[in-house]
């Protein structure tokens, strides 16, 4: 590249000096001088999704939108991210606009509910003001808004049932995101907006599905995750979980349109062992011969459920396989065996009490 004229360089330096004097250090910089541009991430608690996102999780200092049909696992994924943030010593805020947060389920996923900051706002304006105040404090690592559809504007709540409020929620979201975007970036906080799907009337071609709250969130979000339940997981006659597929429909920090598939088990969340088996087979680290799964000389079991059970009972083998997968994708390695989930601990405690 040709060198810039020395007089131009001096003029730029003077202008940058004046800007920094007026607006503070770091308000303007040369991209090459900024060492902070390496994007940090917080894991989603799902190995396949971390790989699909390209940076090992959801990016810090960015807005993330998780959307999909009802009961597809949107809140579960958000709570897993909250649990991972808390494991790293981070603080998490949860704006429960739907008034539907289940603390015992959150505990089962590994969330420290004692230190989870929860707000159940009366209006959309109140919820977004609380979110902004928490982000502005600089002490919050993850803020979750569940959900955009439940952020009802004050005028709609105070009005009559049949009143028309066209575009009111879209304007509210647009204004809130304009205020939030800069603060989120400066404080390195992750803002996760959970959103619902609606159908556009009279669409002949293309998908009729759209998300609530206007277009602003689509523009401001660095990552958008489309969550779908694709199958039920059966054990005997009962259904014990869902098979879930996530498509990364927008990604500003890595290549988009990658997909992840995993199990969400009822009362347990994302199955870490199932994920390790699936990704291990895909990466040819775990060998599948007929119905048998094996890792090197170790036979994991006949059938996927038995292989999952073996990894649950032998966490050091699961850790070894996971770290090999992480190494292959340049993701940070796990340095210790994952602690037992709250559900497993509760199960053991109940068993001990019944034995007594």
Swiss-Prot record:
Q: Does the keyword Nucleotide-binding apply?
A: yes
The regions listed as transmembrane in this protein's record are: none
| GO annotation, biological process | DNA recombination; DNA repair; SOS response
Do you know which SMART domains this protein is assigned to? AAA (SM00382)
Q: Which InterPro entries match?
A: AAA+_ATPase (IPR003593), DNA_recomb/repair_RecA (IPR013765), DNA_recomb/repair_RecA_CS (IPR020584), P-loop_NTPase (IPR027417), RecA-like_C (IPR049261), RecA-like_N (IPR049428), RecA_ATP-bd (IPR020588), RecA_C_sf (IPR023400)
Summarize where ATP binds, as residue positions. Answer: 68-75
Q: Which domain of life is it from?
A: Bacteria
A Pfam family annotated for this chain is RecA_C
Q: Which PANTHER family match?
A: MITOCHONDRIAL DNA REPAIR PROTEIN RECA HOMOLOG-RELATED, RECA
Protein name per its UniProtKB record? Protein RecA
Organism field: Clostridium botulinum (strain Eklund 17B / Type B)
